[in-house]
Amino acid sequence: PLTITGNMGVTKIRESLGLSPLADSVMDSVENGASRIYCIPVKATTEGTISEIKKTGDSSGSCTAEGKPNNAYSVIVEFTGKGGFNTALFTYSIDGGFSKSDEGTLPMTGEFEIPGTGVTLKFTQDASTPEESFHIGDAFTFTTMAPQMTNADALNAIGKLKQFDELFEFVHIVGESTPAMWAAVSEAQA
């Protein structure tokens, strides 16, 4: 298990746990006074998904998103400078616009990996007039779903606690769950 203490900041927690639902939950607990948290990251069997991309603007460029998202994100890519590859400027947000990245230049390859998210953006520019591919104010938006644990994933993590020698107060399972999972957890503890 990874140990997170109450004196760790957001940056240190994210270094340990990444941009994950577990990190989000741990930060909430630390913010509310938890002094020590033992974390058992679980590789979810069901991978995260990416929604359809919606475009705002009338330029000729396009964007797709690929990868295995590691959390639920509300992504907004907004163009702040006109052009094509290696000239257009953009910002991105992974929290629905609450915060934005610094402005960056659209890479020469047309591909940009959003750091720490597991998502890669692939842009296509207009072949005949690349300088008209993206206009100021163009935006591409989409959401992702976090990876999902199966009942077996949760039960395997709980099984590891039986060999854990530290004293702890409770178990917090992070992520979506179903009544069937809780029935399986209850049965495993009997």
Features from the language model and the residues they span:
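Surface-exposed assembly/interface segments
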Residues: 1-190
